[in-house]
């Protein structure tokens, strides 16, 4: 089950060695190279932002990359169903049809199998389809804030039939929704207006964070990606810590670190679409995470402004510029607009005095 993802992790490790060697050799004074650091807690969407940069500025994904993602799509779908079934058990919901007990057994066996995971078998297709249609599973999904479930779960469940077709090829949107934890460093390069950008995405899980700081003290700008929608969720690593609280504390550590005193900070408050759904449609007030939030509880603008203020307040230097954007990282058109504005900001002469270049 895990080999298709472990291959990606091995590839990441090899790439990480290459990048570290190049970093050691790079001339920090080269004015035509702009190094950008992409930071954020796990599952904030920063790797999705990097994929968007690859699509928008670096001619997208190769045929080999697209082909390799098919297994990742399948693995993510089965993993999401496994997590949903765990949540269902936690909430003590029952299946509405008996056949789903056999389907659950297949999901569990597949998740425990460490062999290569390929396209859905007919049995797996039937299991996923009928489980997703089950009323008990749907009830658990509606209560997903009480257990860990990846944001892209519904996207992949709704795509089960399409993914099961013999000639299925992952779309860019499919790839944007895939999830493989970033281990080490991933780099994307592109040139704009005569400047060579090197963008580095580093691991967001706790175990990866200590590797960030010393390697990137010469970064010209930092893009910190924070998920707005995680205010009612807990960390995958410990299942107790509020994810937004964790992200805010991480932002505090990074923005006040001595290595980044002269680094401009760009804050992406990401997943605003999911945030709006929770605040407006599901009526889950931000007060769940912050007792000081006075509302109005269903006011999206008030909630976003509160979170933005929380992040900004973490800077010890109150004069430090923090350029904030509200984003949906899976929306290529919107991300392109935001990235164009960000890169123009980085290149503008107005910010030369801030140590950009």
UniProtKB/Swiss-Prot annotation:
Covalent lipidation (S-palmitoyl cysteine), chain numbering: 4
G4 motif: annotated segments: 266-273
Lipid-anchored residues (N-myristoyl glycine): 2
Region G2 motif: start-end pairs: 174-182
Residues covered by region (G5 motif): 327-332
Chain ranges of the G-alpha domain: 32-357
Single Gene Ontology BP annotation: adenylate cyclase-modulating G protein-coupled receptor signaling pathway
GO molecular function, one term: G-protein beta/gamma-subunit complex binding
CDD domains with a match to the protein in the record: G-alpha (cd00066)
InterPro entries recorded: Gprotein_alpha_su (IPR001019), GproteinA_insert (IPR011025), P-loop_NTPase (IPR027417)
Pfam family, one: G-alpha
Required co-factors: Mg(2+)
Region (G3 motif): 197-206
Keyword entries, A-Z: GTP-binding, Hydrolase, Lipoprotein, Magnesium, Metal-binding, Myristate, Nucleotide-binding, Palmitate, Transducer
Binding residues annotated for GTP, in chain numbering: 43-48, 151, 176, 182, 204, 270-271, 273, 329
One Gene Ontology cellular component annotation held by this UniProt entry: heterotrimeric G-protein complex
Taxonomy, superkingdom: Eukaryota
Residues the record lists as binding Mg(2+): 47, 182
Region (G1 motif): 35-48
Subunit-level organization: G proteins are composed of 3 units; alpha, beta and gamma. The alpha chain contains the guanine nucleotide binding site.
Family membership: Belongs to the G-alpha family.
Function description: Guanine nucleotide-binding proteins (G proteins) are involved as modulators or transducers in various transmembrane signaling systems.
Protein name: Guanine nucleotide-binding protein alpha-1 subunit
Organism: Caenorhabditis elegans
Phylogenetic lineage: Eukaryota, Metazoa, Ecdysozoa, Nematoda, Chromadorea
Gene designation: gpa-1
């Amino acid at each position: 089950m895990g080999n298709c993802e472990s291959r990606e992790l091995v590839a990441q490790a090899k790439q990480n060695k290459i990048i570290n060697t190049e970093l050691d050799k790079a001339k920090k004074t080269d004015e035509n190279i702009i190094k950008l650091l992409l930071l954020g807690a796990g599952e904030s969407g920063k790797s999705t932002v990097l994929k968007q940069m690859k699509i928008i500025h670096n001619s997208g994904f190769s045929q080999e990359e697209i082909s390799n993602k098919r297994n990742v799509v399948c693995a993510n779908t089965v993993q999401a169903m496994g997590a949903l079934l765990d949540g269902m058990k936690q909430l003590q919901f029952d299946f509405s049809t008996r056949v789903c007990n056999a389907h659950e057994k297949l999901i569990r066996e597949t998740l425990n199998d460490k062999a290569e995971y390929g396209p859905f078998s007919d049995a797996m297709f039937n299991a996923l389809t009928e489980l997703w249609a089950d009323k008990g599973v749907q009830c658990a999904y509606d209560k997903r804030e009480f257990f860990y479930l990846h944001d892209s779960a519904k996207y992949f469940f709704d795509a089960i039939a399409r993914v099961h077709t013999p000639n299925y090829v992952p779309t860019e949107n499919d790839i944007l929704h895939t999830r493989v934890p970033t281990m080490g460093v991933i780099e994307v390069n592109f040139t704009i207006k005569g400047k060579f950008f090197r963008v580095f995405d580093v691991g967001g899980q706790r175990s990866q964070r200590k590797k960030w700081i010393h390697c990137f003290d010469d970064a010209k700008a930092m893009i910190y990606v924070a998920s707005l929608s995680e205010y009612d969720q807990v960390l995958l690593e410990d299942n107790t810590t509020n994810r937004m609280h964790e992200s805010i504390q991480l932002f505090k550590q990074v923005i006040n670190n001595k290595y980044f005193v002269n680094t401009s900070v760009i804050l992406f408050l990401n997943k605003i679409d999911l945030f709006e759904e929770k605040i407006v449609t599901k009526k889950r007030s931000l007060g769940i995470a912050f007792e000081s939030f006075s509302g109005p509880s269903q006011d999206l603008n008030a909630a976003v402004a509160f979170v933005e203020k929380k992040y900004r307040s973490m800077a010890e230097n109150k004069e430090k510029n923090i350029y904030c954007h509200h984003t949906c990282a899976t929306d290529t058109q919107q991300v392109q607009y935001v990235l164009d504005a960000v890169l123009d900001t980085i290149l503008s002469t107005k910010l030369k005095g801030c140590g950009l270049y």
